[in-house]
């Protein structure tokens, strides 16, 4: 029990002694933040040979964060490339696209595209994405006339 108390007292004294200002400055560090304070001379601690920056622990922490930033950038780039590739494969699988939307919406068959154009774009012509000159069969909803201005039940 006494050995434990002596060890605690020595740890407390070591902590207090490292926090006192010296001629090269104070060495008060937390786990995450470098809290150097100027001592009597006002010089920073990083100039002293026994500072945390000289031992390499500070560089290891800062080096880890910069490498994770590059890792994040690399992951974002890979994800963007995969999304572009998936989008192109989706366009290749689904031949019909809406020419009226700003982001070309693609559909696997003309019926789905017809429903989209009829409800959103009010019956404009439908085009095939692989052959834009070819017009698909227009979508006629059940119970509706072919003209959008015709007699429609309300």
Curated annotation (Swiss-Prot):
Subcellular location: Secreted; Host nucleus
Main subcellular location of this protein, as a coarse class: secreted
Keyword field: Host nucleus, Metal-binding, Secreted, Signal, Transcription, Transcription regulation, Virulence, Zinc, Zinc-finger
Biased composition (Polar residues): 35-50
Region annotation Disordered: where it falls in the sequence: 24-85
Compositional bias annotation for Basic and acidic residues: 69-85
Signal peptide residue numbers: 1-19
Protein induction: Expressed during multiple stages of host plant infection, including the prepenetration, early biotrophy, late biotrophy, transition and necrotrophy.
GO molecular function: zinc ion binding
Keyword flag Signal: yes
Cellular component aspect of the GO annotation: extracellular region; host cell nucleus
Keyword Cytoplasm: no
Chain intervals annotated as zinc finger (C2H2-type): 96-121
Biological function: Probable secreted effector that translocates into the nuclei of host cells to reprogram the expression of targeted genes by binding on effector binding elements in rice.
Protein known as: Host transcription reprogramming factor 5
């Amino acid at each position: 029990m006494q050995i434990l108390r002596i060890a605690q007292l020595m740890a407390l004294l070591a902590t207090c002694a490292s926090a006192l200002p010296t001629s090269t400055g104070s060495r008060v560090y937390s786990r995450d933040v470098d809290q150097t304070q100027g001592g009597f001379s006002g010089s920073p601690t990083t100039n002293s040979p026994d500072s945390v920056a000289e031992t390499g622990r500070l560089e290891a922490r800062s080096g880890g964060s910069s490498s994770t930033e590059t890792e994040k950038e690399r992951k974002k780039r890979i994800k963007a490339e995969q999304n572009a590739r998936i989008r192109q494969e989706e366009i290749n699988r689904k031949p019909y696209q809406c020419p009226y939307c700003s982001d070309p919406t693609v559909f696997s068959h003309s019926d789905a595209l017809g429903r989209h154009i009829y409800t959103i774009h009010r019956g404009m012509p439908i085009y095939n994405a692989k052959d834009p000159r070819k017009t698909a069969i227009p979508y006629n909803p059940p119970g509706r006339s072919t003209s959008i201005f015709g007699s429609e039940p309300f």
